[in-house]
Protein backbone atom coordinates (compact mmCIF):
# COMPACT_ATOMS: atom_id res chain seq x y z
CA UNK A 1 0.00 0.00 0.00
CA UNK A 2 1.51 3.32 -1.09
CA UNK A 3 0.64 6.76 0.11
CA UNK A 4 0.73 9.67 -2.31
CA UNK A 5 0.45 13.31 -1.37
CA UNK A 6 -1.05 15.55 -3.95
CA UNK A 7 0.13 19.16 -4.06
CA UNK A 8 -2.55 21.52 -5.27
CA UNK A 9 -1.68 23.39 -8.43
CA UNK A 10 -2.63 26.71 -6.79
CA UNK A 11 -0.08 26.38 -3.96
CA UNK A 12 2.73 25.60 -6.40
CA UNK A 13 1.73 28.58 -8.52
CA UNK A 14 1.74 30.79 -5.46
CA UNK A 15 5.17 29.47 -4.49
CA UNK A 16 6.44 30.17 -7.98
CA UNK A 17 4.97 33.65 -7.84
CA UNK A 18 6.78 34.54 -4.62
CA UNK A 19 10.30 34.07 -5.93
CA UNK A 20 10.33 37.02 -8.36
CA UNK A 21 8.94 39.31 -5.65
CA UNK A 22 11.99 38.70 -3.44
CA UNK A 23 14.32 39.51 -6.31
CA UNK A 24 12.33 42.62 -7.16
CA UNK A 25 12.52 43.98 -3.61
CA UNK A 26 16.25 43.33 -3.50
CA UNK A 27 16.70 45.14 -6.81
CA UNK A 28 14.63 48.05 -5.53
CA UNK A 29 16.75 48.20 -2.38
CA UNK A 30 19.94 48.32 -4.44
CA UNK A 31 18.57 51.09 -6.65
CA UNK A 32 17.60 53.12 -3.60
CA UNK A 33 21.07 52.57 -2.14
CA UNK A 34 22.70 53.76 -5.36
CA UNK A 35 20.46 56.82 -5.37
CA UNK A 36 21.38 57.71 -1.80
CA UNK A 37 25.06 57.08 -2.44
CA UNK A 38 24.95 59.47 -5.39
CA UNK A 39 23.41 62.14 -3.16
CA UNK A 40 26.08 61.52 -0.51
CA UNK A 41 28.91 61.90 -3.05
CA UNK A 42 27.42 65.16 -4.35
CA UNK A 43 27.01 66.28 -0.72
CA UNK A 44 30.74 65.76 -0.14
CA UNK A 45 31.67 67.73 -3.27
CA UNK A 46 29.39 70.60 -2.25
CA UNK A 47 30.95 70.66 1.21
CA UNK A 48 34.40 71.02 -0.30
CA UNK A 49 33.15 73.99 -2.32
CA UNK A 50 31.52 75.51 0.75
CA UNK A 51 34.76 75.14 2.74
CA UNK A 52 36.63 77.07 0.06
CA UNK A 53 34.03 79.85 -0.20
CA UNK A 54 33.57 80.26 3.58
CA UNK A 55 37.27 80.35 4.41
CA UNK A 56 37.94 82.60 1.42
CA UNK A 57 35.30 85.01 2.67
CA UNK A 58 36.85 85.12 6.15
CA UNK A 59 40.41 85.46 4.81
CA UNK A 60 39.49 88.17 2.29
CA UNK A 61 37.67 90.22 4.89
CA UNK A 62 40.41 89.70 7.46
CA UNK A 63 43.12 91.00 5.10
CA UNK A 64 41.21 94.03 3.84
CA UNK A 65 43.31 96.68 5.60
CA UNK A 66 44.31 99.68 3.50
CA UNK A 67 46.38 102.73 4.40
CA UNK A 68 46.27 105.84 2.24
CA UNK A 69 49.63 107.08 0.94
CA UNK A 70 49.20 110.55 2.46
CA UNK A 71 48.99 111.52 6.12
CA UNK A 72 49.20 114.58 8.36
CA UNK A 73 51.30 115.27 11.39
CA UNK A 74 48.65 113.84 13.69
CA UNK A 75 46.56 111.50 11.52
CA UNK A 76 47.18 108.55 9.25
CA UNK A 77 44.24 107.53 7.12
CA UNK A 78 43.60 103.81 7.15
CA UNK A 79 40.65 101.43 7.00
CA UNK A 80 40.39 97.85 8.17
CA UNK A 81 37.76 95.26 8.97
CA UNK A 82 38.41 95.75 12.70
CA UNK A 83 37.12 99.33 12.41
CA UNK A 84 33.62 97.91 11.88
CA UNK A 85 32.07 95.60 14.51
CA UNK A 86 29.89 94.07 11.79
CA UNK A 87 32.96 93.03 9.81
CA UNK A 88 34.54 91.61 12.97
CA UNK A 89 31.41 89.50 13.50
CA UNK A 90 31.60 88.47 9.84
CA UNK A 91 35.18 87.19 10.14
CA UNK A 92 34.42 85.26 13.34
CA UNK A 93 31.16 83.81 12.01
CA UNK A 94 32.64 82.72 8.68
CA UNK A 95 35.59 81.21 10.54
CA UNK A 96 33.17 79.13 12.62
CA UNK A 97 31.24 78.13 9.50
CA UNK A 98 34.41 77.12 7.68
CA UNK A 99 35.62 75.15 10.70
CA UNK A 100 32.31 73.33 10.97
CA UNK A 101 32.41 72.44 7.27
CA UNK A 102 35.89 70.96 7.64
CA UNK A 103 34.75 68.89 10.63
CA UNK A 104 31.65 67.72 8.75
CA UNK A 105 33.67 66.18 5.91
CA UNK A 106 34.36 62.87 7.77
CA UNK A 107 30.63 62.52 8.51
CA UNK A 108 29.91 63.09 4.83
CA UNK A 109 32.36 60.30 3.98
CA UNK A 110 30.52 57.98 6.40
CA UNK A 111 27.27 58.87 4.61
CA UNK A 112 28.90 57.74 1.34
CA UNK A 113 30.03 54.43 2.84
CA UNK A 114 26.68 53.84 4.58
CA UNK A 115 24.09 55.55 2.37
CA UNK A 116 21.16 54.10 4.33
CA UNK A 117 22.33 55.49 7.71
CA UNK A 118 19.66 57.90 8.92
CA UNK A 119 21.41 59.20 12.05
CA UNK A 120 24.37 60.74 10.19
CA UNK A 121 22.13 62.39 7.62
CA UNK A 122 19.81 63.79 10.30
CA UNK A 123 22.75 65.15 12.32
CA UNK A 124 24.20 66.87 9.25
CA UNK A 125 20.80 68.33 8.40
CA UNK A 126 20.42 69.90 11.85
CA UNK A 127 23.97 71.26 11.99
CA UNK A 128 23.80 72.51 8.39
CA UNK A 129 20.66 74.45 9.25
CA UNK A 130 22.39 76.10 12.22
CA UNK A 131 25.45 76.94 10.10
CA UNK A 132 23.20 78.28 7.33
CA UNK A 133 21.52 80.63 9.81
CA UNK A 134 24.86 81.95 11.09
CA UNK A 135 26.24 82.28 7.55
CA UNK A 136 23.17 84.18 6.34
CA UNK A 137 23.21 86.55 9.31
CA UNK A 138 26.89 87.40 8.81
CA UNK A 139 26.55 87.84 5.05
CA UNK A 140 23.44 90.03 5.29
CA UNK A 141 24.90 92.26 8.00
CA UNK A 142 28.16 92.72 6.12
CA UNK A 143 26.30 93.41 2.87
CA UNK A 144 24.45 96.30 4.51
CA UNK A 145 27.73 97.91 5.66
CA UNK A 146 29.33 97.36 2.24
CA UNK A 147 26.38 99.13 0.63
CA UNK A 148 26.83 102.10 2.95
CA UNK A 149 30.57 102.14 2.25
CA UNK A 150 29.88 102.35 -1.48
CA UNK A 151 26.90 104.73 -1.45
CA UNK A 152 26.76 106.40 1.96
CA UNK A 153 23.52 107.77 3.41
CA UNK A 154 22.69 111.43 2.90
CA UNK A 155 19.88 111.41 5.47
CA UNK A 156 22.26 110.27 8.21
CA UNK A 157 25.23 112.27 6.82
CA UNK A 158 27.23 109.08 6.29
CA UNK A 159 29.77 109.59 3.56
CA UNK A 160 30.81 106.92 1.08
CA UNK A 161 34.37 105.83 1.85
CA UNK A 162 35.00 103.68 -1.20
CA UNK A 163 36.10 106.66 -3.25
CA UNK A 164 39.13 106.97 -0.97
CA UNK A 165 39.60 103.35 0.10
CA UNK A 166 39.09 101.50 -3.18
CA UNK A 167 41.15 98.40 -2.36
CA UNK A 168 39.48 98.05 1.03
CA UNK A 169 36.00 98.16 -0.47
CA UNK A 170 36.95 95.76 -3.23
CA UNK A 171 38.16 93.17 -0.73
CA UNK A 172 35.21 93.45 1.63
CA UNK A 173 32.82 93.23 -1.32
CA UNK A 174 34.58 90.07 -2.50
CA UNK A 175 34.30 88.58 0.97
CA UNK A 176 30.56 89.25 1.07
CA UNK A 177 30.06 87.69 -2.37
CA UNK A 178 31.98 84.57 -1.28
CA UNK A 179 29.83 84.32 1.85
CA UNK A 180 26.64 84.38 -0.21
CA UNK A 181 28.06 81.61 -2.39
CA UNK A 182 28.40 79.46 0.73
CA UNK A 183 24.81 80.37 1.68
CA UNK A 184 23.61 78.97 -1.65
CA UNK A 185 25.67 75.81 -1.13
CA UNK A 186 24.18 75.36 2.35
CA UNK A 187 20.69 75.68 0.91
CA UNK A 188 21.47 72.89 -1.55
CA UNK A 189 22.91 70.74 1.25
CA UNK A 190 19.84 71.17 3.44
CA UNK A 191 17.45 70.38 0.58
CA UNK A 192 19.46 67.31 -0.46
CA UNK A 193 19.55 65.99 3.10
CA UNK A 194 15.80 66.48 3.45
CA UNK A 195 15.17 64.66 0.16
CA UNK A 196 17.47 61.78 1.17
CA UNK A 197 15.66 61.40 4.51
CA UNK A 198 12.25 61.56 2.83
CA UNK A 199 13.20 58.80 0.39
CA UNK A 200 14.26 56.53 3.25
Swiss-Prot record:
Per the record, a Pfam family? CASP_dom
Keyword vocabulary terms for this entry: Cell membrane, Cell wall biogenesis/degradation, Glycoprotein, Membrane, Transmembrane, Transmembrane helix
Sugar attachment sites are 153
Chief location bin: membrane
Which GO biological-process labels does this protein carry? cell wall modification; cell-cell junction assembly
Report the subcellular localization.
Answer: Cell membrane
Q: Which residues lie on this side of the membrane: Extracellular?
A: 60-88, 143-175
Q: Show the stretches that span the lipid bilayer.
A: 39-59, 89-109, 122-142, 176-196
Membrane side Cytoplasmic: residue ranges? 1-38, 110-121, 197-200
Any coiled-coil regions, as ranges: none
How this chain sits in the membrane, per its record, is: Multi-pass membrane protein
Q: From what superkingdom does this record's organism come?
A: Eukaryota
InterPro entries in the record = CASP/CASPL (IPR006459), CASP_dom (IPR006702), CASPL (IPR044173)
GO cellular component: a single term: plasma membrane
What the protein does comes down to: Regulates membrane-cell wall junctions and localized cell wall deposition. Required for establishment of the Casparian strip membrane domain (CSD) and the subsequent formation of Casparian strips, a cell wall modification of the root endodermis that determines an apoplastic barrier between the intraorganismal apoplasm and the extraorganismal apoplasm and prevents lateral diffusion.
Which family does this protein fall into?
Belongs to the Casparian strip membrane proteins (CASP) family.
How this chain assembles, per its entry, is: Homodimer and heterodimers.
Put simply, this protein is called Casparian strip membrane protein 1
Amino acid sequence: MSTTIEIPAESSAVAKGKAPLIGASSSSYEKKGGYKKGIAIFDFILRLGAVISALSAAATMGTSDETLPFFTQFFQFEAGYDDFPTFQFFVIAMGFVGGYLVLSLPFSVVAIIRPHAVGIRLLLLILDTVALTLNTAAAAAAAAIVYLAHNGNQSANWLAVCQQFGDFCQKVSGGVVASFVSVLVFLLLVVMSAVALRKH
